[in-house]
Amino acid sequence: MAAIDEKEYTQSFDWKIWKRLGPFLRPYRGAFVSMLVFNGICALVDVVLPLFQKYAIQNFIEKNTLTGMLPYALAYLAVILVQALSVVIFARNSMHIEMNLGKDMRGSLFHHLQTLSFSFYNVTPVGYLLTRVMSDTNRISSMLAWNFTDILWAVFYVLGTFAAMLALNWRLALAVIAIVPVMAILTGYFQNRILHWNRKVRKLNSRITGAFNEGITGARTTKTLVTEEQTADAFRSLTRQMHDSGIRAARLNAVFIPLVLFFGTMAVSIVLLRGGYMVLDQALELATLSAFTAYAVSIFDPIQMTAANLAEFISLQASIERVTDLMDEQPQIQDTPEVIEKYGDAFHPKRENWEPLRGEIEFRDVTFRYPDGGENVLEHFSLHIPQGTTVAIVGETGAGKSTLINLACRFFEPTEGQILIDGVDYRQRSQLWLHSNIGYVLQNPHLFSGSVRENIRYGKLDATDEEVEAAARAVSADTVVSKLENGWDSDVGEGGDRLSTGEKQLISFARAVLADPRIFVLDEATSSIDTQTEQLIQNAIDHLLTNRTSFLVAHRLSTIRKADVILVVKDGHFVEQGKHEELLRRKGYYHDLYSKQFAQESAARILGDGSAQ
């Protein structure tokens, strides 16, 4: 994933990238047009206001009279009211665009993420996704709604001001306009460098988000391994880099802003000096000089702001690329158009066309290698699993026990060969059809924030409270509920962190019972669980295995002995298969594994029973 984080995005303007925003912007064309019109009105009013100042000096101050003041005041008030109304309308439109555009982009991204394959989440850090779904979409919607507004106002205002200055006195106007190219070059020079460091800050912010997420979710591990200092040092290193980049940008700004003020002051000085002589020579009216001074004071801020915003827009292009790259990410496992037409997809399932699943599975001459792997993990592997068979997969940690399960669940597909479900190649059926018939309980099951009842109901969203409680009783998960202060409505915490591993497994078993899958997959927990909970878990497993085709990544001797077929994995390859007694008689790798690991478990149990007595 480092390659993803370090990708260098296009730095020059690329219209093709911006066109990708078209589908998101199209619903808000009316709001954009309205924003454009009323923004133009605001800029026009800002251009006109110094002319009111000129009129007041000419007609009231120089003539020392208030004749005509009331119509003047009413006209001035009307212009201010028009400006205020325009600000309200374009601000509402900008807010409407920002909120809805951000909502649409986040919704579309989240919808797309639901379609991506299991393998994508295996290699993609959560921080990477959070940055794109939240930070990048917020930045895009905010800049299009507000920075774009600022650019429009600045362009309208600068053009209007130039026109007004030229109309008032073209010689004096040219003296001010001559400074503009110098300001433009200066702004371009500094903004490019400021933008470079701001980009670095954003890139580091993405890494910090990921590191922060890992630091919080892994806090227990950090504390138990006493690695707080190392974790904090690594986090501090990232924040220090971000701090240093931010300081560099701030230093450039500290030089740039005074230079802008200097040239702005120079423009005003030129107007006052040259204009003053022209007033003395009666070549220019004092009222006109007053208006000119107001224009000279105000014209350079919009120019500088426009340059800064344009630089930010080039930077924004990287955010658009990051979001669209994620949108372009394709599921590794995809149903064919014919399958989707018949069975539907994850968001539009055609359940009426789904055939009942019995649970007969056949691996037929399957060869498989992982997409990023060079060698085959399986070669010409064949196995017939009748309906209701329990298959235990054993092997040392890291041996590749999950490969067969990933293939059976269609998280990956065979490189060669076929996998048949009920006699039909599972690629001829939809993924949703298969996954809706699979109950998957992980070593450390994931529970969602919410109550125990809500977590069990994830197995069947329309289940009644009675069905939820019956499913829990079937696997003794009600014993967990009885210990909780608020019973079924107790909050399990984020990820279920208020429950022990054993309790989370029991809740997951209840969820699986409620879903009533025809295929059950269990990755047994390797962590130690108290004897009482372990017995409850074993009873729950026995209940779930009944009349279901089951795959068990097994660690307990009692589970393995009950299996109809044991598959033995070594270095990513299946080296033996058979029943427990048969494999022991062969005195092969399973026998060695049993002697080293499972005999120790038996001895530990005997010692435990003896001490208990």
Per-segment meaning from a language model:
Residues 32-89, 166-171, 282-286:
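Transmembrane helix-loop-helix hairpins at lipid-water interfaces of multipass membrane proteins
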Residues 343-613:
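ABC-type nucleotide-binding domain
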Residues 17, 25, 90, 94-98, ...:
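Juxtamembrane loop-to-helix connectors within ABC transporter transmembrane domains
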Residues 62-71, 164-178, 248-321, 326-327:
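Helix-loop-helix
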Residues 113, 235, 323, 363-365:
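Conserved catalytic Walker-motif region of ABC-type ATPase nucleotide-binding domains
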Residues 37, 45-49, 86, 98, ...:
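Hydrophobic alpha-helical transmembrane segments of ABC transporter permease domains
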Residues 22, 27-30, 118-119, 135-144, ...:
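An intracellular "coupling" helix at the cytosolic face of ABC transporter transmembrane type-1 domains
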